[in-house]
């Protein structure tokens, strides 16, 4: 298992991720793919939120390296309740190119970082085809109102179909009350249902 840290992420100053650029993310993904290429006969990639954005890119541009992908509430664009659709291009162009001072959603998520992940998504293959991909797993929290869940399902379905891969698309059980935080152990619901959730992730990945 290889768990890399994305550029400017995971630092003591939680706002440093706002410095990230799409070009840095692409280099990070390419370097990571090179590091894991010799780890085994079958490789998979798992990503949550922005990590799901990157996992989708790796599946398509990994030259057949990854046969499985698990997308946990992947962030391709914000839900319309967070950012109206007509503003997404503005977010991508203005904040993605660092033309305005950064702002932080809920005091934590950088607009600039969010915009650069959208830029990565904009550079997916038109047909979303991923050579060598055998299975796509998608899990979205039942109470997740941060991501465009319809887009997440559409991208996962199209990538699976055009790659000749199987697809497992599930939503966490409503009684768990899981939102966007599918893996953070500090989340109350994740902590309460940790075993059930992690069993679900393994099952959907391996199906």
Label the model's feature ranges.
Residues 1-13:
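Conserved alpha/beta-hydrolase
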Residues 11-39:
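Catalytic nucleophile-loop/oxyanion-hole region of alpha/beta-hydrolase
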Residues 49, 75, 142-144:
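Residue-level signal for short, function-critical loop segments
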Residues 109-179, 190-202:
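Serine-hydrolase catalytic core
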Residues 46-51, 55:
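Gly/Ala-rich beta-loop-alpha elbow adjacent to hydrolase catalytic centers
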């Amino acid at each position: 298992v290889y768990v890399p840290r994305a550029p400017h992420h995971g630092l003591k100053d939680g706002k440093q991720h706002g410095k990230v650029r799409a070009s840095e993310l692409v280099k990070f993904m390419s370097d990571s793919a090179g590091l894991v290429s010799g780890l085994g006969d079958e490789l998979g990639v798992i990503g949550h939120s922005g990590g799901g954005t990157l996992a989708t890119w790796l599946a398509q541009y990994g030259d057949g390296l990854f046969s499985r992908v698990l997308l946990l509430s992947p962030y391709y664009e914000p839900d319309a309740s967070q950012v109206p659709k007509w503003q997404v291009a503005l977010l991508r162009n203005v904040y993605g190119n660092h033309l305005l001072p950064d702002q932080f959603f809920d005091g934590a998520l950088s607009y600039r970082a969010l915009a650069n992940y959208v830029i990565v998504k904009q550079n997916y293959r038109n047909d979303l085809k991923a050579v060598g991909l055998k299975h796509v797993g998608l899990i979205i929290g039942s109470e997740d109102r941060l991501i465009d869940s319809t887009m997440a399902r559409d991208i996962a379905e199209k990538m699976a179909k055009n790659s000749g891969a199987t697809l497992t698309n599930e939503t966490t059980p409503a009684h768990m009350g899981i939102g966007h935080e599918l893996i953070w152990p500090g989340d109350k619901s994740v902590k309460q249902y940790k075993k059930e959730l992690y069993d679900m992730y393994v099952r959907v990945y391996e199906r």
